[in-house]
Structure formats: structure tokens, C-alpha cells
Amino acid sequence: MQKIKEYIKKLEEGCDLSSEEAEAALEEVLSTAEDGEIETFLLALKAKGEKPQEIVGFVRGMKKAGNMIKPNTPFRIVDTCGTGGDGLNTINVSTAAAIVTAAAGVPVAKHGNRAATSMTGSSDVLEALGIKVDLSPEYVRKTIEKIGIGFMFAPVFHPAMKRVAGVRKKLGVRTVFNILGPLTNPAGAKGQVVGVFDKNLCEPIAYALAELGTEHALVVHGDGMDEITNTGETYVAELKNGKVSTYTLTPESLGMLRASPGDTKGGSPKENARDLLCIFKGQKGPKRDLIILNAAAALYVSGIVGSIRQAIPIAEDAIDSGKVMVKFNQFRTFTGEFYQIDKKQGFIPGKTALSPSRVSMLSPASGEQA
């Protein structure tokens, strides 16, 4: 029996949904609800404001409908992912930071998609760099296990999202789906740096991550940016040891130079790819500093250091020693090889249904360690 109308009425009356109700509502939205009902539901929720328990329910519903993987790694897996939607068109900070983090020895399961409001999304710049982004889930798992980094293309891992694409486009406003991406990491990353487009989302998302089992997370909003910024103050809600604390960071407090907003602007996928390659090869400047700050945050939530500041020299060394270029080349080579295998097996991103034999590979196979 459909309950979406009941949930809409409750939201319109200003009442919060329980996590169970939110999960059930999300399941209807992704399956049987009509477009008009989806539209009304999303707008009513937006008008009321999303609460942590509602976000938790939506995330659980998304994961239930998605393709999850369980990579076997020696250390805590981390993700660097932003909501996007800040409208600032900076370079691809979280994507570059993910590669730097992996080069420093921390396994990364990067969740991402194409550009929503900026010129260049994470998958756009990776493709411009020659990295195959639309691998099947089991080959993403293998990439993470073999080289310590994998990219999880949202349409492959969350195919049910196609169901709401038309409504979201028609609405043309931010909805709860804009904040679910960073929270629905298909590899179950336990360390996360989550950038958000609105400072007021930092604490609700941190509390939601606590409920979802994340071990250490930084939910950040920096000077209008969904990253830790080097152009001004960054507001942080940190989840650690089950508790959430809030504070403000500045570039100076982390030993970095302050930059001007124009110094970190991005461009087209090709332009951003060129910038990232120059940085990976050692070019210094504000864009490199921005990437280092966010990679240091990822290293911090991985548990290998006790603070972001302690991690900055590690991130710098990963670039200066050449480790980042080695990791980048591995990433490009492995994804290219696995893409060809996928192609031979008939995998079509977003279209090919996973057979039972392929689904069984989404977690370590028999004989492998869990």
C-alpha cells in the first residue's frame, strides 16, 4: 500500500519523518510514486528542512536500491566527496585530493558523478585525464584492492536514481538528493571528508553519518565552497569517537598561505585536467595548496595522523616525491584494462543488469578474505 500521500501531508504540516518513514518514502519515490507526488514530496521536505534521522532513512533506502561493494583493504577506506552546487566553479579539488591521498598509502573509494552546476564534475575531469570511470562494481572493487583507489560512478552504483532525474531537472532547485551522494558511498567508506554547499548542513550531516556508522568524518563548508578552502574560513562539523564537534579553520591556522577566490577557479574538463597534471608533476601555487589541504583532511580521517596539520607534509611529499604521478598512471592503466574486460563481457553502464554470478563478486569471493 502506497503511503507517499501520508508522508507528504505530514511534511506539509511541518512534522518530521522517522528514519523508518523516510526510508519507506524513498523506496516509493524510486519505484511506484508518480512524478507529481515525487515533486510535491521533495518540495515539502525542502520547505520543512531535512533532519538527521530523515537523512539516515533516505541513505538506507538509497543503499538498499544500489550496488554495494566490500573491498578488502588493510586500512580504513576514505572518500572525498562534495555535494557540489556551490556555484563557484573551482578546480576538481576532491578528485585530485583522492589521488594524492591514495598515493600517500590510504585506500580511497571515490564516489562521484558528472557536473551538476559547475562546468566539470569528478567523472568529467577523470575522463579528460584518460581514466575510465564507468567500470562495473566488481572491477571497481578490484581496482581499490590492487592499487588503493577506485572511482564509483553514481549512475552505475545507484541506477534507480534515473527514476527521479526528470523531476529533479524540472524542479531546478536543490533537494535532499543533492546531499545524498556523499552519504551513500557504495564501498561503505568509514572515513569521509564531505563538502556541503550550505554551512547549515554541516551538523545535520555529521549526526547522520554517526548514525550510519561512519567512524571519522569532517563535514565542511569553506568560504562558500564545498571544500576546505584556502581563501577564507572553513566551518567544520567533525564526527570522531561517536561525538560531533564544530570549529573553524583558516589557511593560516594550518600553516598555509591565504589565496584569492580567483586563484582557484576551474574551467572545462580539458582545462582542469591540464591543471591537475601540472600540479601532480610538482607545480606550486594556490590550486596545489587547496588540493593539499583537502588531501591532508582525508589522511586525517583515515587515522594515520592526529591532525590535518600533521598530514600536510605527507600530502606534499606524495606530490614532490613523484608518488602521485605513479598512482595516477596506475589508475589510468588499471581502469583501462578492466574497462576492456567489462566490454568483452557485455557490461553497459546503467543498462546491463548484473547477473547472479557478477553480483557475487561485489564482495570478496569464496576463498578471499572478507
From Swiss-Prot:
One Pfam assignment: Glycos_trans_3N
UniProt-annotated binding residues for 5-phospho-alpha-D-ribose 1-diphosphate: 82, 85-86, 90, 92-95, 110-118, 122
Known catalytic reactions: N-(5-phospho-beta-D-ribosyl)anthranilate + diphosphate = 5-phospho-alpha-D-ribose 1-diphosphate + anthranilate
Gene Ontology process terms (BP): L-tryptophan biosynthetic process
Residue sites binding anthranilate 1 per the record: 82, 113
Alphabetized InterPro entries for the sequence: Anthranilate_Pribosyl_Tfrase, Glycosyl_Trfase_fam3, Glycosyl_Trfase_fam3_N_dom, Glycosyl_Trfase_fam3_N_dom_sf, Nuc_phospho_transferase
Record's cofactor remark: Binds 2 magnesium ions per monomer.
Binding residues for anthranilate 2: 168
Pathways involved: Amino-acid biosynthesis; L-tryptophan biosynthesis; L-tryptophan from chorismate: step 2/5
EC number: 2.4.2.18
Domain of life, per lineage: Archaea
Cofactor names: Mg(2+)
UniProt-recorded Gene Ontology molecular function terms: anthranilate phosphoribosyltransferase activity; magnesium ion binding
Recorded family membership: Belongs to the anthranilate phosphoribosyltransferase family.
HAMAP family on file: TrpD
Known role: Catalyzes the transfer of the phosphoribosyl group of 5-phosphorylribose-1-pyrophosphate (PRPP) to anthranilate to yield N-(5'-phosphoribosyl)-anthranilate (PRA).
Stated name of the protein: Anthranilate phosphoribosyltransferase
Native source organism of the sequence: Methanosarcina mazei (strain ATCC BAA-159 / DSM 3647 / Goe1 / Go1 / JCM 11833 / OCM 88) (Methanosarcina frisia)
